[in-house]
Amino acid sequence: MSEFVIETQHLYKRFGQVTALEDINIKIRQGEFIAIMGASGSGKTTLMNILTGLDTASEGKIILDGVDAAQLDEIGRQRFRAEKIGLVFQQFHLIPYLTALENVMLAQHYHSVIDEAAAKAVLEQVGLGHRIDHRPSQLSGGEQQRVCIARALVKIGRAHV
């Protein structure tokens, strides 16, 4: 197991003639909280997409929990993401016909470990224990976001983005 959950070395991302990321070097330890800040169009989303395996870098090295991401094909990146990284997107991606509890348990499905008690516990942690049987349309935007956070936390992953 690596000292760093996420590490980049001389990371670059180019879109044609446009350099979106230039010489990015970061090291993030497990349990560490960081903020990626910058103006609109500064590359924050591009960086997050690369760090989570949703995109690839033009050059440089990305080491995710000791694994060189460049050595992973698309299937390998998908598997790594499913097993190691909890994601909370700007768009919530909740299944509208599932309850809050079922949406959280969906993350467990990919690990073949369904633990309703754990799903209820993380919903309690994010302050939604009383809303577990509500569908997304019955929740406020903030509550929907907390369901997504619970869905990310219930996974066994080492990084939550």
Language model: regions and residue ranges:
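ABC family nucleotide-binding domain
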Residues: 3-158
